[in-house]
Regions:
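ATP/NTP-dependent adenylation/nucleotidyl-transfer catalytic domains that generate, transfer
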Residues: 1-127
Length: 127
């Protein structure tokens, strides 16, 4: 039973399986979780800009993901992080970053209408 649980992909959508197989794997849509965790940590905890996060990711994941794959998911990460902020905003908006968490209750205070353009411009220069 534990092996079945460990072999089950993470998918918060909880869609029922089709023909005994999971219909949607979130990681297929958003990218490898290990990359997203890496991007999130260095963006929020260290305050690094996209170009620095990209350089470190290329070194860290050398032999695991190539530059193009890392760049693809970095672009996706920034786009989704900003576009999905409204889902995390259940309290009044206000900027504040504490530790690596996106909860608006104590760690991340980010306006739900923040613009991703500044970050995406930096990421686009990496191509």
């Amino acid at each position: 039973v534990l092996y079945d649980i460990l072999d089950t992909p993470v998918s918060p959508e909880l869609l029922p399986p089709k023909d005994g197989k999971i219909a949607q794997k979130t990681e297929d849509l958003v990218g490898p979780y290990e990359l997203h965790d890496f991007f999130l940590y260095y963006m929020l905890r260290a305050g690094y800009e996209p170009d620095k996060i990209f350089r470190i990711a290329v070194q860290t994941f050398d032999g695991v993901y190539d530059r193009e794959v890392i760049l693809k998911w970095l672009k996706n990460f920034y786009r989704r992080f900003f576009m999905q902020q409204f889902k995390r905003s259940c309290l009044p908006d206000g900027p504040k970053v504490g530790t690596v968490a996106v909860s608006p209750r104590g760690d991340l205070r980010m306006s739900s209408d923040s613009c991703v353009r500044i970050w995406m411009d930096q990421v686009e220069k990496l191509s």
